[in-house]
UniProtKB/Swiss-Prot annotation:
One of its GO terms (biological process) is immune response. SMART domains: SCY. Disulfide bonds join C40-C66, C42-C82. This is Growth-regulated protein homolog alpha. Pfam families: IL8 (PF00048). It comes from Bos taurus (Bovine). Keywords: Cytokine, Disulfide bond, Growth factor, Inflammatory response, Secreted, Signal. Belongs to the intercrine alpha (chemokine CxC) family.
Length: 104
C-alpha cells in the first residue's frame, strides 16, 4: 500500500500546485486595473465650468472604445468632470487651455 501512496503523491502535488496557480492568476486578473476600458468614460456631461477651477483638460477623440468626443477636465480639487464638447462655453475653455499651453 505504501508504494501506491507514494506514486499518487506527485500527481496530487502537481494537481494542487496547478489549482493554486489558477486561483492566483484569476485573482490577479479580477483585481488588475483596466488601463483603457472599452466604453465611454463620460456618462453625463456639464455644459461648462469656471475656468479658474480647471487644472487641465483632456480631449479624447472617437475610437473603437467610444464613438463620441470626450472632454474631461481635471479640477484643482482633484476631481474630474466630463464636459459637453459641443457646448459654446466648453469650446471657449478648450481654446483658452490650448492657447495657455502654447504660450508656455
Amino acid at each position: 500500500m505504501a508504494p501506491a501512496a507514494t506514486a499518487a503523491a506527485p500527481r496530487l502535488l502537481r494537481a494542487a500546485m496547478l489549482f493554486l496557480l489558477l486561483v492566483a492568476a484569476g485573482r490577479r486578473a479580477a483585481g488588475a486595473p483596466v488601463v483603457n476600458e472599452l466604453r465611454c468614460q463620460c456618462l453625463q456631461t456639464l455644459q461648462g465650468i469656471h475656468l479658474k477651477n480647471i487644472q487641465s483638460v483632456k480631449v479624447t477623440t472617437p475610437g473603437p472604445h467610444c464613438d463620441q468626443t470626450e472632454v474631461i477636465a481635471s479640477l484643482k480639487t482633484g476631481q474630474e468632470v466630463c464636459l459637453n464638447p459641443t457646448a459654446p462655453m466648453v469650446k471657449k475653455i478648450i481654446d483658452k487651455m490650448l492657447n495657455k499651453a502654447s504660450a508656455n
